[in-house]
């Protein structure tokens, strides 16, 4: 007997990625990617999006469930995008209704992309994880989600868990301290102040890849910079852990390559801020889905 398959769609500001996902194994087939901007410039984003969905459903006639991750805020009912900064044309559009009318007999599930990626870790992670966890994505910004009893925590009106906007050091929110752009600004500042030996460039062109590579080779300055990042992240995590009473944290996203170098500072900082109750059972882990997190996360919405 063939296993159930879902269509997962990860809508990003740069590309829209979609593929057929085996619900049992997480294997992705019929992968397709299209640049978001050309659909936007056509003036008919939702129509072009629907055309791509039609091709997938035509080629996979047994697929009756479609999960869609969007980079922004949704209404409480998960049917209408409210604020999608990368694709403002769909703000306020009854997206689920439009797609359901075009594809009768097919169910559509809409969710914030970070929430979807978080849920995907429960269903498709390499190692089985607890039903309750905080999920943090480190990349251009700092995103996140909370999964409670295998369900996405959406808060009162549907858009809870914006960890990047937690107050942090220097009068800034967290993602204005450790988002990619700000991280590199910090690295170049620390390099300009540093008088020791380091392989990091003094020309103001440090990259995240170079910063990780230098740390891997034991570069003292690179390790110090990642330590500072880990401290700031952990200060935010301490609040989330206490507010939600969740002791498992998964860290993913493009900058999660730094995981091994921020982890000691995370543990040390959490040890300072958390009382024994919250330390008991505390686990900080690396998310495992990598580049497939968005697509697998979108497909995981179909389990709900």
What residues fall within each predicted segment?
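A charged helix-plus-loop insertion that forms the helical arch/lid used to bind
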Residues: 79-92
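Short gly/Ser/Thr-rich phosphate-binding loop of adenylate-forming enzymes
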Residues: 93-99
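Glycine-rich phosphate-binding loop of actin/hexokinase-like ATP-binding domains
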Residues: 128-181
